[in-house]
Amino acid sequence: IEICAVLAFSAIQNGDKVGLVLFSDVVEKVVPPKKGKKHVLRIIRELYTIKATGKGTSISTAMNYVNRLLNRRSIVVLASDFQDTEYDTALKITNQKHDLVNLSIRHPFEEELPDLGLLSLYNAETNEQVMVDSSNKRLRAHLQSKLKEKHDAFDKHMVKLQMDNIVVHTDKSYIRPLMSFFQRRLSRY
């Protein structure tokens, strides 16, 4: 939420409009683009108070909605953990119509599962629950390796699609990744 607020305030300082589309497997909430501090505060309030009704994630649904909503070329920031599939076409279309910036949110447990003993893990996307013995070193190493492969493949795929991708970790400051992104953009233009 904080990084979205920073980006929104930065945009209004630049005189730009800011909007919000919150989604799960459906579009949950839309705040149409407007200018002004009061509008950004409304967006922040919506981010804090949203109660999602959907169970999964459909990036395609959200991007298709954004493409219908925005008539003019805009900067679109997609903040997600990208635990979805089948979104390439929607991202490509959005990237062609707009300036798409993917903000990949990653949790420390996705980097390294801690030794916490027996865990009951619930996947809200698939509605599945599994028991995992996190004190098993081989299992932790295997899971860590698979997650690293998945993240590396995603990052390479974004490069292949020529899309901007900012990786932000929930347990670390977002300042460095944002600054690095803006410096790369400045050197490009």
Positions of predicted regions on the chain:
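RNase H catalytic domain
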Residues: 23-41, 45-49
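Von Willebrand factor
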Residues: 39-74, 86, 107
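A conditional alpha-helix N-cap/helix-loop micro-motif detector
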Residues: 1, 55-59, 147
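An amphipathic, basic-hydrophobic helix/alpha-beta surface used to engage anionic
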Residues: 1-33, 65, 75-78, 84-85, ...
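Short hydrophobic/aromatic-rich motifs at helix boundaries and adjacent loops
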Residues: 15-18, 34-36, 61-62, 126-128, ...
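Von Willebrand factor type A / integrin I
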Residues: 65-75, 84-189
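Charge-dense, low-complexity intrinsically disordered segments
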Residues: 34, 53, 141, 145
